[in-house]
Amino acid sequence: MLGVLAIIGVLSVGAIAGYSKAMMKYKLNKQAEGLTMLLANCIPLSKQLPAVNEWKIYTGILPKLNLLPDSISIIRSNEMKDILGIESYFYHTSGENEWGIFYYVPESSFGKEICYNLIKTVKEFHADMYYIFRSKNRTDTYHGMGT
């Protein structure tokens, strides 16, 4: 009897782990889909933004222009959150067509997969993006990579 319960317990743990991994894969796909749509919407917008002297955050105008995909929501006036809970903002800088999306990717068990997913998705738009920035939180120094 205990052997049967032990086998059921092991199978249950395996099923839960498999379900968790499958759900994360689903969310990563949804994140990539949302980011692709967001970038496709932001590229034309970025070319219409006025010149600025410093960084300027434009996240707040995205919902007003109906440019946010369903999987991304505004959480503060200048920040958005995707299906994985990753916070980000859309910005424009002083250079011509220099814009981007800054991501806060916290350390987590799936942090590496999330970063890989973001970079893989953004690579499709490399001709229109200047930098990719990422930070663990608001107090961490940012890490960027030019295209």
Where in this protein do the model-derived segments appear?
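Detector for methionine-enriched segments
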Residues: M1, M23-M24, M37, M80, ...
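N-terminal single-pass transmembrane signal-anchor helix
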Residues: M1-M24, Q31-G34
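N-terminal alpha-helical signal peptides/signal-anchor transmembrane segments
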Residues: Y19-A22, A32-V52
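Short, charged/polar micro-motifs that form catalytic or ligand-binding hotspots
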Residues: K25-L28, S108
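Periplasmic/extracellular, small/polar-rich flexible segments of pilin-like filament-forming proteins
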Residues: Q48-T147
